[in-house]
């Protein structure tokens, strides 16, 4: 089998959907289906079962896909070793980044990185910090940028802290929250963030909010607060250049600002790769030059 065919099987196994896999591979669905049939014929067995719900990997397919994964990873490793011998920054930088950081801070970091190292490639996934940590544990990525205080036995570099604010278009004093009928707009988040907010709230008010609205995305939560629908608690990274809303810092019982730390994590061998070293240096230089939030 050619490496291109192995990569195709890896993508199909990840998506389990012909349309999505075809989009990722930049081919048409009929062409992808025909190539899959050719591969299955060469192996003499079905790799996937097709249904209206998508694809299901067969027992034989599991072994073939594991082989495809192993060969693909080995190919990447050899390419990285060759790139290191040539002394230039090549290879793929694999990142797993918390969504908030990926949306509001990472783009300018990556812009600098790709301008300095145009031959390097980037593979990026974003999501809740707990999901990104799982990708790191499973060795799917080189580097994780995680919020909170994750348990990690490898290298763990502190990057920054952004403080939490209660934002509202009408209320300008946190104590007034106890008397308002306005809804508390919340967004779905990982458990550690939710627990921090719950802990602060019950220490401060000793009772539950009178009304709540729960939305899927932090940006939806922010826009609803900015448009006066209710109040929200948001990290400062999402509030840059937002001057038309009241922003009240959350303080703990000792009067200290409450914030969320952001960390750069990875296994030690990953930091030996030149593309990873270059990325870490870009971040360090950027943090030395400016306050991120």
Curated annotation (Swiss-Prot):
Every HTH lysR-type domain range: 1-58
Q: What are the annotated disulfide bridges?
A: none
Family matches, as PANTHER family = HTH LYSR-TYPE DOMAIN-CONTAINING PROTEIN, HTH-TYPE TRANSCRIPTIONAL REGULATOR
Keywords annotated in UniProt? DNA-binding, Transcription, Transcription regulation
Keyword ATP-binding assigned to the entry: answer is no
Q: Which gene encodes it?
A: ykuM
Query: A GO molecular function for this record?
Result: DNA-binding transcription factor activity
- Family the entry assigns: Belongs to the LysR transcriptional regulatory family.
The answer to whether the entry has keyword Ribonucleoprotein is: no
Instruction: Name the lineage.
Output: Bacteria, Bacillati, Bacillota, Bacilli, Bacillales
- Protein name as it appears in the record: Uncharacterized HTH-type transcriptional regulator YkuM
InterPro entries tied to this protein? LysR_subst-bd, Tscrpt_reg_HTH_LysR, WH-like_DNA-bd_sf, WH_DNA-bd_sf
SUPFAM superfamilies in UniProt? Periplasmic binding protein-like II, Winged helix' DNA-binding domain
Origin superkingdom: Bacteria
**Which PROSITE patterns did the record assign?**
HTH_LYSR (PS50931)
Which GO annotations describe the biological process of this protein? regulation of DNA-templated transcription
What transmembrane ranges does the database entry give? none
DNA-binding region(s), residue ranges: 18-37
